[in-house]
Amino acid sequence: MVAATGTGKTVISALDYKRFRKQNPDRPCRLLFVAHREEILKQSLYTFRAVLKDANFGELFVGNYKPESIDNLFLSIQTFNSQSFTEKTSPDFYDYIIVDEFHHAAAPTYQKLLSYYQPRILLGLTATPERMDGKSILPYFHNRIAAEIRLPEAIDRKLLCPFQYFGVTDTVDLLSLIHI
């Protein structure tokens, strides 16, 4: 899913996961939500709990947070890479995997996770699918984007507040830094 910051990617992903659980009542529907920052993971966990109306849903595995169960996990990519996490789970353990800031997925730090797991659903969330190194993330999704709303459209549709940029000029001569 490609959507501008603030348009509700996490809420939409939680609603889709809720739909998935309802359609699969006889499965455990284990969720793995992966992000690169603790703040994103905490906010996402709270969003899922609100959408699912379950104050006990999911656990964090990041920083000082250690889960009692890994069934529905909000995991940092750093923790995944440092904990030999694949030894604790089979490739099909998670039914639904969400990777926030999916534009990072082409980086080596995400390759182990994406090549190991075989979820029934893989959902990538990003506002910026284009990468500076030219690597595409679309092959993970059969070269398709499931849903897309870019910043100009989100503003035009009044999903976001309009904004203004302000530039500040200064007199600092940065040319002297070239020789450092």
Report the location of each language-model feature.
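Loop/turn-to-beta-strand initiation segments
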Residues: 30, 70-72, 94-96, 119-123
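Conserved RecA-like ASCE P-loop NTPase motor core of nucleic-acid helicases/translocases
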Residues: 29-37
